[in-house]
């Protein structure tokens, strides 16, 4: 292991920063890209603000789909389903 310059900050030590930038890919290689990627992607730990998800309102065309279906009366047959015998 190479000696580390004590006058240099730890985040500037050689090998402390990955050569490539972090991305949004969740493959195994990208999950182990750096410590931050491992925490965020591999373990699912996010520090910071949580984005507030807005509920999607139903479009008017979907709200009216219940009124388009006519209600059919239920046929209540008792006895022989072939019809009344005389």
UniProtKB/Swiss-Prot annotation:
The keyword Acetylation applies. The modification Asymmetric dimethylarginine is found at residues 52-53. Its main location: host cell. A motif (Nuclear localization signal, RNA-binding (TAR), and protein transduction) lies at residues 49-57. Residues 48-58 have a biased composition (Basic residues). Residues 49-86 are annotated as: Interaction with the host capping enzyme RNGTT. It is found in: Host nucleus, Host nucleolus; Host cytoplasm; Secreted. GO terms for molecular function: actinin binding; cyclin binding; metal ion binding; protein domain specific binding; protein serine/threonine phosphatase inhibitor activity; RNA-binding transcription regulator activity; trans-activation response element binding. One of its GO terms (cellular component) is host cell cytoplasm. Zn(2+) 2 binds at residues 25, 27, 30. GO terms for biological process: DNA-templated transcription; positive regulation of transcription elongation by RNA polymerase II; positive regulation of viral transcription; symbiont-mediated perturbation of host chromatin organization; symbiont-mediated suppression of host innate immune response; symbiont-mediated suppression of host translation initiation; symbiont-mediated suppression of host type I interferon-mediated signaling pathway. The modification N6-acetyllysine is found at residues 28, 50-51. Interacts with host CCNT1. Associates with the P-TEFb complex composed at least of Tat, P-TEFb (CDK9 and CCNT1), TAR RNA, RNA Pol II. Recruits the HATs CREBBP, TAF1/TFIID, EP300, PCAF and GCN5L2. Interacts with host KAT5/Tip60; this interaction targets the latter to degradation. Interacts with the host deacetylase SIRT1. Interacts with host capping enzyme RNGTT; this interaction stimulates RNGTT. Binds to host KDR, and to the host integrins ITGAV/ITGB3 and ITGA5/ITGB1. Interacts with host KPNB1/importin beta-1 without previous binding to KPNA1/importin alpha-1. Interacts with EIF2AK2. Transcriptional activator that increases RNA Pol II processivity, thereby increasing the level of full-length viral transcripts. Recognizes a hairpin structure at the 5'-LTR of the nascent viral mRNAs referred to as the transactivation responsive RNA element (TAR) and recruits the cyclin T1-CDK9 complex (P-TEFb complex) that will in turn hyperphosphorylate the RNA polymerase II to allow efficient elongation. The CDK9 component of P-TEFb and other Tat-activated kinases hyperphosphorylate the C-terminus of RNA Pol II that becomes stabilized and much more processive. Extracellular circulating Tat can be endocytosed by surrounding uninfected cells via the binding to several surface receptors such as CD26, CXCR4, heparan sulfate proteoglycans (HSPG) or LDLR. Neurons are rarely infected, but they internalize Tat via their LDLR. Through its interaction with nuclear HATs, Tat is potentially able to control the acetylation-dependent cellular gene expression. Modulates the expression of many cellular genes involved in cell survival, proliferation or in coding for cytokines or cytokine receptors. Tat plays a role in T-cell and neurons apoptosis. The cell attachment site mediates the interaction with ITGAV/ITGB3 and ITGA5/ITGB1 integrins, leading to vascular cell migration and invasion. This interaction also provides endothelial cells with the adhesion signal they require to grow in response to mitogens. This is Protein Tat. The gene is tat.
């Amino acid at each position: 292991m190479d000696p580390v310059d004590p006058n240099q900050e730890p985040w500037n030590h050689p090998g402390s920063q990955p050569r490539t930038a972090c991305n949004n890919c969740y493959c195994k290689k990208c999950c182990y890209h750096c410590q931050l990627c491992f925490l965020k992607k591999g373990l699912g730990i996010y520090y910071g603000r949580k984005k507030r998800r807005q509920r999607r309102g139903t479009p008017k065309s979907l709200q009216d789909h219940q009124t388009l279906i006519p209600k059919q009366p239920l046929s209540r047959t008792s006895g022989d389903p072939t019809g009344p015998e005389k």
